[in-house]
Amino acid sequence: MSGNGVFRDPPGGRKAVAVWSIGVAVYFVAVIFRTSLGVAGLEAADRFHVNASALSTFSILQLLVYAGMQVPVGLMVDRLGTKKVLTLGAVLFTAGQIGFALSPSYGMALAARALLGCGDAMTFISVLRLGTRWFPARRGPLMAQLAGLVGMAGNLVSTLVLAPVLHGVGWVQAFAGSAVAGVVVLVPLVLFLKDHPEGHEPPVRAGGGGFVRRQIRDSWQEPGTRLGLWVHFTTQFPAMVFLLLWGMPFLVEDQGLARTTAAGLLTLVVASNMGFGLLYGQLIGRRQSARIPLALGTVGLTALLWAATLAHPGPHAPMWLLVTLCVVLGTCGPASMIGFDFARPANPPDRQGTASGITNMGGFLASMTTLLAIGLLLDATGDDYRIAFSSVFAVELLGLTQILRLRPRALARERTRLAAVRPPSTPSAPSAPSASAAAAASAAPADPADSPRPAPA
C-alpha cells in the first residue's frame, strides 16, 4: 500500500509463483478428498448398506457444510490472512479423510465427510486471496482459472489413481493412504507460505460483530457480488453433480457401460475442464465483454446436451453423444469462475474474501440441491435416471432467471465505477489506472487491460 492509501499492484514474479503453488497444492489435495466418493459411490452403498437417498446424503452433507462455511471463511481470510486459514483447513480435511477410511458405520462416516467439507471449504477462497495479493490485477482471471484447473487435476487423480487403488487394496487402505497427501502439503504450508509480498500489507480493520455485519452487508449490497453468486450457481453444478456422485452410477447402471469405460468418460470431463479453463481465462483476461456470453453459452449448451442424452430413444444413448456431453460438462467449471470476475471488481481489496465466499456458495448450493433431488427421484421412480436427472433443468432455469435480472444493474454499476476512476484523456496518460488502486476505492474493473474500452453493455 502506498503512502496515499492507494493499493499498488503486487509485482508477481518467481516468488509469487512459488508461494501461490503452495496454496494450490493444498487445494489440489482438498479436491482429491472431496471427489473421492465420486469413484466409490457403489462401494460406499455396499459398505454402509444404504440406498440412493442415503448415499446422496454423504455428498449433500459435505456440500452443505462447504456452502455454509463460505461466508465465515471469507471473513476469516479477510481478518486472519491466508496462511492461518489454509493451515486449519488442511488439518481438518486430512482428519476427515482418515475418519472416513476408518468409519465402521454410516453415522460416523457422515461425521467424517462433514469434517472433510469444513476443511475443504477453507481452501479455494484462500487460494483466490493469494492470487490477488501476489499477482497484478490484470492476471486475476487467469490465476483464478489456473487454480480451478489445478483443482480439476485433483479430480483427475481421484478418477485415474484412487479408483483402481480402491478396487485393488480395499476401502481402508485406499482412503487412509490418500490421507498422507494432506500431511505432505502441510509441511511447506507451515514453513514457507506468506500472506502477501513485503510492502503490500492489507489494511487492518477493527474486528468484532460490527466488522462481520459490515463486511457481509457491504459485499451483498453490490450487484456484482450477487450476479457472481448466480453465475456460479447456474454454471458449476451440472459437472459437480456428475463428478461428485451420480456420474458413475448413471453411466454404469443406466447406460450399461463397463466401469473402466465410465471412468474414462469421467476423466474426459476433467480433461475438458482443464483445457477450457485455460481458454476461458485467456478470453476474459483480454476482453471482459466475453463474461456474460461465455456464461450463458455454457448454460445453454449444457442444457441442450443433457436434453439430447435423456430424451434419446432406446435404452442407451450412443457413445458419441455421451462423449459430447462429457466434453461440454467440462466447460462448467471454467464458466463458474466467471462469477468471481463479477464479484472481484465490485469490492475493494479488504472485502475480497467475504465477496468471494458469497460467490462461491452459489454452485455448491445448486449442487447440494440437485444431488438431493436426484437421490429422492431415483428412490421414488425405481431408479429412473432420466426423470431424476431432469431436475438439472429446473435448477438451471432458476439461475438463468437471476442472471438476466441482475446483469443490467451490475454492469451499469461497473460502468459508473470505471468512469469514476478513469483519468482525463491526455497524451501523457495513455494507460488506465491500476485495478488495485481502483479496487481500493471500490471502483475497479476486473481487468485493467479493458479499461480504455467502454464497459460491456
Predicted regions and their residues:
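Extracytoplasmic gate region of multi-pass secondary transporters
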Residues: 37-38, 223-278, 370-371, 375
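Conserved MFS/SLC helix-loop-helix module at the cytosolic interface between two early adjacent transmembrane helices
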Residues: 68-107
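Helix-to-loop junctions at the C-terminal end of transmembrane segments
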Residues: 69-81, 276-290
